Curated annotation (Swiss-Prot):
Bridged cysteine pairs (disulfide): none
EC number: 2.3.3.8
Family: Belongs to the succinate/malate CoA ligase alpha subunit family.
Organism: Arabidopsis thaliana
Classification via CDD domains: CCL_ACL-C (cd06100)
Residues binding ATP: 214-234, 265-291
GO terms of molecular function: ATP binding; ATP citrate synthase activity; metal ion binding
Binding site for CoA: L292, I293, D294, A295, G296, A297, I298, V299, P300, T301, S302
UniProt-recorded name of the protein: ATP-citrate synthase beta chain protein 2
Record keywords: Acyltransferase, ATP-binding, Cytoplasm, Lipid biosynthesis, Lipid metabolism, Magnesium, Metal-binding, Nucleotide-binding, Transferase
Biological process, per Gene Ontology: acetyl-CoA biosynthetic process; lipid metabolic process
GO cellular component: ATP-dependent citrate lyase complex; cytosol
Main localization, broad class: cytoplasm
Name of the gene: ACLB-2
Tissue: Expressed in trichomes, epidermal leaf cells, anther tapetal cells, stigma and in young vascular bundles of expanding leaves, cotyledons, roots, pedicel of flowers and siliques.
């Protein structure tokens, strides 16, 4: 292991199995230290995605939530620490998955009781791949003024009291997380404070040992002395003894092994941790303390004397000029949360909406980060605005031109279709523009204009699975599903839909690939062998060509394409386009002052 620092002021982590308080404490520590970016880059919650709202100082931020470790690592390649709050049942599997990600360098396992066989596998893999495991059964670690893991060092008040908001000169490592909090306070009282502190965890087989971190501290110039707090049970301390004897550590080490009282008991005693139990003589606290003394460590006569030993060692370093004075800073005040601040009037209230597509807080609105003035000055069109507000990126001009063509071709299709009919009837009833528009829009669905998304889904699935038109169509037939995007009440083989022809012509001339459109055409060829009106309609044309636009632009991942189709972007295109015509029909009826519409009796079949 060895090498040097694990963390810095720019270190970011992925947090597995979301727990609100530890994450918020990390972010509060970040703010206290004056970090510019939050230390939590993303949260992994198996089975859920989205954003989690948390506070970074006075501002509320949205931290991405990912369903899988692989997706989180891909989305946040600079995050190299994995903080695992999974239960002992799943901690090993998720930790191994994290270790196998090339971007992850450090894994902290909080859970206690991870099977020892699983822990051994994690240790072996980490060592073979030059990675670091902290834990299991750990509270984590901290680099003062830079980064902390989860609940390390406790509350903000304790962190301030221990001066952990700025770096000191002492490297500290212990097995116990609870005792590490006590020792941070002790070190702060008699020295200039902690530089880095690690709790390796109390299980029998820790992922990294006391000596691993002492050797690492020895390579960090800012650390001038080390403090070690071991405990009875196991032989971890002896690896530190060997390192001291071999001269691998050239900085003062103050050490104490807790558990000297175990000899007062007649039988074996199990203390708090799995690894803290009295066993053979070599595992006793007395034997370990003596071995550390013999190796050159500074070991007091009791735990009560540990503070004095640390103080004397530090003062000696100061006298020798090996420690430079630390510049004290005043940490910022962390805002209180709402419930605790109501009485005092110090409040920060959570937001209720997350928006990622536009921002109107500056001097001018921005669409996906592009200022309104730039949109006008650079000659953006409606298609460009849609690409920013719908897809959150600037698409190539041929893509935005295609969007504009779709809008123009789908703006209206006469007064006889269901949407226009409803709008006309509503307008003639004296209703307002919005009511008339909505009346028409509500007819859009699987039978009228709303088949674009379904057409895209089915064509994509069939094409991606290399189904022949026969397999695709007959498979749909067996399921009792009509093929979306195929069939028209008016158009036929001999009377093609001009809109479809125009879209296909544009795509063949401008798209880098029309794979999905060509597949839709082969499906049309097959369906026309069954009936003359089973032509590719405008829904099918837009659906298949939009797949080609998304895939051919090179600006979308497969997952993003699937999400776009699933959410209903393509039907949104028809809704937007047809709104133009429906508004036109509303104005037309009102301008013509048409009376209330009543359907004629002769057009109704009255039957029992």
């Amino acid at each position: 292991m060895a090498t040097g620092q694990l963390f810095s002021r720019t270190t970011q982590a992925l947090f597995y199995n979301y727990k609100q308080l530890p994450v918020q404490r990390m972010l509060d520590f970040d703010f206290l230290c004056g970090r510019e970016t939050p230390s939590v880059a993303g949260i992994i919650n198996p089975g859920s995605e989205g954003f989690q709202k948390l506070f970074f100082g006075q501002e509320e931020i949205a931290i991405p939530v990912h369903a899988a470790i692989e997706a989180a690592c891909a989305a946040h390649p600079t995050a190299d620490v994995f903080i695992n709050f999974a239960s002992f049942r799943s901690a090993a599997a998720s930790s191994m998955a994290a270790l196998k990600q090339p971007t992850i360098k450090v894994v902290a396992i909080i859970a206690e009781g991870v099977p020892e066989s699983d822990t051994k596998q994690l240790i072996a893999y980490a060592r073979a791949n030059n990675k670091v495991v902290i834990g299991p059964a750990t509270v984590g670690g901290i680099q003062a003024g830079a980064f902390k893991i989860g609940d390390t060092a406790g509350t903000i008040d304790n962190i301030i009291q221990c001066k952990l908001y700025r770096p000191g000169s002492v490297g500290f490592v212990s097995k116990s997380g609870g005792m590490s909090n006590e020792m941070y306070n002790t070190v702060a009282r008699v020295t200039d404070g902690i530089y880095e502190g690690i709790a390796i965890g109390g299980d029998v087989f820790p992922g990294s040992t006391l000596s691993d971190h002492i050797l690492r501290f020895n390579n960090i110039p800012q650390i001038k002395m080390m403090v070690v707090l071991g405990e009875l049970g196991g032989r971890d301390e002896y690896s530190l003894v060997e390192a001291l004897k071999e001269g691998k550590v050239n900085k003062p080490v103050v050490a104490w092994v807790s558990g000297t009282c175990a000899r007062l008991f007649k039988s074996e005693v199990q203390f708090g941790h799995a690894g803290a139990k009295s066993g053979g003589e070599m595992e006793s606290a007395q034997a370990k303390n003596q071995a550390l003394i013999d190796a050159g460590a500074i070991v007091p006569t009791s735990f009560e004397a540990l503070e004095s030993a640390i103080k004397e060692t530090f003062e000696k370093l100061v006298e020798e000029g090996k420690v430079s004075p630390i510049k004290e800073v005043i940490p910022p005040q962390i805002p209180e949360d709402l419930n605790s601040a109501i009485k005092s009037g110090k409040v920060r209230a959570p937001t209720h909406i997350i928006s990622t597509i536009s921002d109107d807080r500056g001097e001018e609105p921005c669409y996906a980060g592009v200022p309104m003035s730039s949109i006008i000055e650079q000659g953006y069109g409606v298609g460009d605005v849609i690409s920013l507000l719908w897809f959150k990126r600037s698409l190539p001009r041929y893509c935005t031109k295609f969007i504009e063509i779709c809008i123009m071709l789908c703006a209206d299709h006469g007064p006889c279709v269901s949407g226009a009919h409803n709008t006309i009837v509503t307008a003639r009833a004296g209703k307002d523009l919005v009511s008339s528009l909505v009346s028409g829009l509500l007819t859009i669905g699987p039978r009228f204009g709303g088949a674009i998304d379904d057409a895209a889904r089915y064509f994509k699935d069939a094409c991606d699975r290399n189904l022949t038109p026969y397999e695709f169509v007959e498979g749909m037939k067996k399921k009792g599903i009509r093929v979306p995007g195929i069939g028209h009440r008016i158009k036929s083989r001999d009377n093609r839909d001009k809109r479809v022809e125009l879209l296909q012509k544009f795509a063949r001339s401008n798209f880098p690939s029309v794979k999905y459109m060509e597949y839709a055409v082969t499906v049309e060829t097959y369906t026309l062998s069954k009936a003359n009106n089973l032509v590719l309609n405008v829904d099918g044309a837009i659906g298949s060509l939009f797949l080609d636009l998304l895939a051919g632009s090179g600006m979308f991942t497969k997952q993003e394409i699937d999400e776009i189709v699933q959410i209903g972007y393509l039907n949104g295109l028809f809704v937007l386009a047809r709104s133009i015509g429906l508004i036109g029909h509303t104005f037309d009826q009102k301008r013509l002052k048409q009376p209330l519409y009543r359907h004629p009796w002769e057009d109704v079949l009255y039957t029992k």
